Swiss-Prot record:
<dbReference type="GO" id="GO:0051301">
    <property type="term" value="P:cell division"/>
</dbReference>
<protein>
    <recommendedName>
        <fullName>Cell division topological specificity factor</fullName>
    </recommendedName>
</protein>
<keyword id="KW-0614">Plasmid</keyword>
<comment type="function">
    <text>Prevents the cell division inhibition by proteins MinC and MinD at internal division sites while permitting inhibition at polar sites. This ensures cell division at the proper site by restricting the formation of a division septum at the midpoint of the long axis of the cell.</text>
</comment>
<dbReference type="InterPro" id="IPR036707">
    <property type="entry name" value="MinE_sf"/>
</dbReference>
<keyword id="KW-0131">Cell cycle</keyword>
<dbReference type="GO" id="GO:0032955">
    <property type="term" value="P:regulation of division septum assembly"/>
</dbReference>
<comment type="similarity">
    <text>Belongs to the MinE family.</text>
</comment>
<dbReference type="InterPro" id="IPR005527">
    <property type="entry name" value="MinE"/>
</dbReference>
<keyword id="KW-0132">Cell division</keyword>
<dbReference type="Pfam" id="PF03776">
    <property type="entry name" value="MinE"/>
</dbReference>
C-alpha cells in the first residue's frame, strides 16, 4: 500500500460527467429523428389549415451542438396561395 494514495485521491467526478454527456448525446441522437418527423408533420398540419402549400417544397434541418439544438423549417408558400379562414 502506498501512503501517497491516501492523500492523492482520484477525482471521479470529471469521468462521471463525461460518461453522462456521452449517454445524453446518444439518447438525443437516437430520439432526434423521430422528434423531427413528428414536429414536421404537426407544423405542416397547422400551416395547411390556413394556407394551401406543396409538401414537397418544405425543408427541415436540425443543428445540434453541445448546448442547444436548433430546428429550422423552410416552407415555400406560393404568392397565389388561397388563405383559408381558421
Amino acid at each position: 500500500m502506498n501512503i501517497f494514495r491516501l492523500f492523492n485521491k482520484q477525482r471521479t467526478a470529471p469521468a462521471a460527467r463525461e460518461r453522462l454527456q456521452v449517454l445524453l448525446a446518444h439518447e438525443r441522437s437516437s430520439a432526434g429523428s423521430d422528434l423531427v418527423t413528428l414536429l414536421r408533420e404537426e407544423i405542416l398540419a397547422v400551416i395547411a389549415k390556413h394556407v394551401q402549400l406543396d409538401h414537397d417544397k418544405v425543408q427541415v434541418t436540425i443543428d445540434r451542438n453541445e448546448y442547444v439544438s436548433t430546428l429550422e423549417i423552410d416552407v415555400e408558400i406560393p404568392l397565389n396561395a388561397a388563405v383559408q379562414a381558421a
